[in-house]
Amino acid sequence: MIRKRLIIVAGGTGGHIFPGLAIANNMITQGWDVRWLGTKNRIEADLVPKHGITTYFLSIYGYGLHGKKQKILAIVSILQAVLQSYYIMRKWRPDIVLGMGGYISGPCGLAAWMCKIPLVIHEQNRVTGLTNYYLSKFAKKVLQAFPSVFPNANVVGNPIRKEILAVIEPSLRLCNRTGPIRILVIGGSQGSKIINQILPVVAAQLAGKYVFWHQVGKGALKEVQQVYTSMLKNQLNYKLVEFIDDIAIAYAWADVVICRSGALTISEIAAVGLPAIFVPFMHKDRHQYWNALPLEQLGAAKILEQPNFTAEKVSQILMSWDRSKLFTMAQRARTIAMVDSTERVTSELIELANNTKH
């Protein structure tokens, strides 16, 4: 029997890559041959091959470069990426191409259309990205994590890694927990400057009553460590790391999360059941704000946009949440979790492949 073939296109940030990996691993268990298109200078270059997935790296720059020369280079690199991905698809002939959003999906989606290979796109945010907006015009299927982003698109959630889904539910994890309240701080895989600046002050204000596990981002450890040391002196109520390798362990440890509100982060926090303070990344479409809003409306989280993100406000919010309140918030977060998202996406891909004539 000839194995069905899938190319997944995802790169740049964990929010695109980790859902893609969840889908890839699930499709492999279904007997599919899966390959990956990404970029060689971002985290997928290290992460994806570790899963045993054949990975092709495209030479491409983002759309948002400034300056005439940089914009010309970006256009040239996009055209080059179209040709590279076209060649790969013509040679390997996948049954489906799945784009997970981000700028790399643009040229690869165009190449799939040129090769007459069915294209499926997945929109992770509550506000559609520019690339997916254009790709939706000729994609065979449009999948979305949240309702109402695209009219008539199927809602499938954001695929989540199995180890995160395996975290014990709040009723067993949190109900009898005692001791200092545990604060998990995540600025994304690349870190967040404002979170790194504010949290040492918060840790100093709350010393003795709270403990902190802070992911500072690549290259920021030494600088942030110096700030914590100067603020907390001999206090040992914090742990700093550049990157948390096993985020499921961190989620299971935490009572509260302070983080950005990327779509995948929102989905993971809901699936685990964790209260949160969200600090949306400032973008003109405010997509991270809209991602976080349903959890705030449920009473499961608090949103502090960057102009309002101060040590005083963070400390005030944390001190107003006792363990009983945190347990209630955690249970509320779980009510909007879509824990079968990976299976939903897998089902959509298999259905399309079975209904496509070659």
UniProtKB/Swiss-Prot annotation:
Pathway: Cell wall biogenesis; peptidoglycan biosynthesis. It comes from Baumannia cicadellinicola subsp. Homalodisca coagulata. It holds the Pfam family Glyco_transf_28. Transmembrane segments: none annotated. This is UDP-N-acetylglucosamine--N-acetylmuramyl-(pentapeptide) pyrophosphoryl-undecaprenol N-acetylglucosamine transferase. Its EC number is 2.4.1.227. InterPro entries: GlcNAc_MurG, Glyco_trans_28_C, GlycoTrans_28_N. It comes from the Bacteria. It is a peripheral membrane protein. GO terms for cellular component: plasma membrane.
